[in-house]
């Protein structure tokens, strides 16, 4: 028996063949009249999203999913997720990054900061906590011999990025002392980007790319982390035409083919001019980019603790239902490749998930293991929250990161 449980609104579906308005309307609404009802509705949301996306949802899914619950709350900061996913990331760097990422709470693009002066996707913890966590991170970055495994140009680049990280953290601490919310958030992003670059340099010099099946060897592959800037044309909440930037980070360590294919299309200008096809409270999806020679991109999901990803199948179909992906749908602005429900290995567009990460508890997000996550929005979440169907991507370009095409 299959179930379809609804949340407070209709959910959009991804890609051709993933569903219809009639099917979406079949999801029953849950009236939020009490905290208990709201909590049940939030748990149900994970099931409903998957149901309307055309995924099979067995009746025992909640019992199975309880086996997947982690021992700690899931990480919802996109940059922290990416840093933790870097192979061979040094402990001092990971710990510094987690200290920095912990000062904000991640939301859905419309949080007002504690000072009230900025619209943001992040909320701030207490000022004393921010100062303490930033000081702890600076202490981790101030140790001796941290980059001893590197030499030559790699060493020079890593040392420069280490100074960039420390500069951003000092500015972050000073901003907290002055209670400047926007400056804390902007310097957090800058500092974590610098730390991610250092981790990527170390990893790319100490590890090899993850193996991929021979049948996919000719597809573009990315090794490392690449930053992509989307310039989008849209209207503000007041209706004024404007343009804004959304910064993405692609993870070629964990999803070499998916991220590589996305980055290759960006490099070739295939996303320039694409329209936003679907937008609602849950997701934003683009049109499918036109290619001279379309290639099928297999679904690609790396499971925690494994050296190579699963290809061509969902985790449930692979018998890995209880395993957790390295790149989960935990963060606002998770970027994934779309595909029809009846073909996990077809060429598709991409979509962003816009749900508040606190709305779906860990272990109950049924998008995990059914779609290939490519990366995350690391800046510009408020622009993402303003996008509507009919808006467009003016341009997409690679703007930074540490990566190679292989």
Predicted regions and their residues:
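N-terminal chloroplast transit peptides
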Residues: 1-37
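Acidic/proline-rich low-complexity IDRs
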Residues: 10-13, 17, 52-54, 61, ...
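The N-terminal extracellular segments of secreted preproproteins, especially immediately downstream
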Residues: 26-27, 47, 88
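Cyclophilin-like peptidyl-prolyl cis-trans isomerases
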Residues: 60-406
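Single-pass hydrophobic alpha-helical transmembrane segments typical
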Residues: 36-63
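Short, intrinsically disordered low-complexity segments
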Residues: 21-23, 32, 38-41, 63, ...
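Secretory pathway export signals and precursors
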Residues: 23-24, 44, 85
């Amino acid at each position: 028996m299959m179930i379809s449980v609804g949340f407070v609104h209709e959910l959009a579906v991804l890609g051709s063949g993933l569903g219809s308005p009639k099917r979406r309307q079949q999801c029953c609404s849950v009236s939020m009249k009490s905290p208990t009802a709201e909590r049940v509705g939030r748990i149900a949301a994970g099931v409903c999203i998957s149901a309307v996306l055309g995924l099979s949802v067995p009746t025992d899914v909640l019992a199975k999913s309880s086996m997947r619950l982690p021992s700690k709350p899931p990480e919802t900061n996109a940059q922290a997720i990416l840093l933790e996913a870097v192979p061979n990331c040094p402990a001092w760097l990971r710990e510094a990054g987690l200290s920095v990422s912990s000062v904000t709470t991640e939301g859905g693009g419309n949080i007002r900061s504690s000072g009230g002066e900025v619209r943001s996707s992040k909320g701030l913890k207490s000022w004393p906590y921010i100062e303490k966590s930033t000081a702890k991170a600076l202490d981790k970055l101030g140790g001796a011999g941290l980059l001893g495994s590197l030499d030559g140009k790699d060493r020079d680049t890593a040392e420069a990025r280490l100074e960039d990280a420390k500069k951003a953290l000092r500015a972050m601490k000073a901003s907290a002392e002055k209670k400047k919310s926007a400056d804390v958030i902007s310097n957090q992003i800058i500092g974590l980007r610098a730390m991610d670059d250092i981790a990527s340099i170390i990893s790319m010099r100490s590890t090899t790319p993850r193996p991929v099946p021979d049948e996919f060897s000719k597809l573009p592959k990315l090794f490392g982390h690449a930053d992509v800037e989307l310039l989008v044309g849209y209207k503000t909440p007041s209706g004024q035409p404007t343009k804004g930037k959304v910064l993405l980070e692609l993870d070629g360590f964990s999803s070499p083919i998916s991220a590589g294919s996305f980055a290759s299309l960006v490099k070739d200008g295939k996303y320039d001019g694409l329209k936003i096809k679907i937008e609602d409270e849950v997701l934003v999806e683009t049109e499918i980019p036109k290619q001279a020679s379309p290639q099928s991109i297999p679904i690609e999901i790396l499971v925690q603790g494994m050296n190579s990803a699963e290809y061509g199948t969902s985790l449930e179909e692979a018998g890995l239902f209880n395993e957790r992906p390295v790149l989960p749908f935990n963060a606002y602005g998770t970027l994934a490749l779309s595909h029809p429900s009846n073909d996990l290995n077809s060429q598709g567009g991409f979509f962003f998930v816009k749900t508040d990460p606190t709305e779906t508890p860990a272990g109950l997000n049924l998008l995990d293991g059914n779609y290939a996550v490519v990366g995350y929005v690391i800046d510009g979440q408020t622009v993402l929250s303003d996008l509507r169907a009919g808006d467009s991507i003016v341009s997409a370009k690679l703007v930074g990161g540490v990566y190679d095409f292989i």
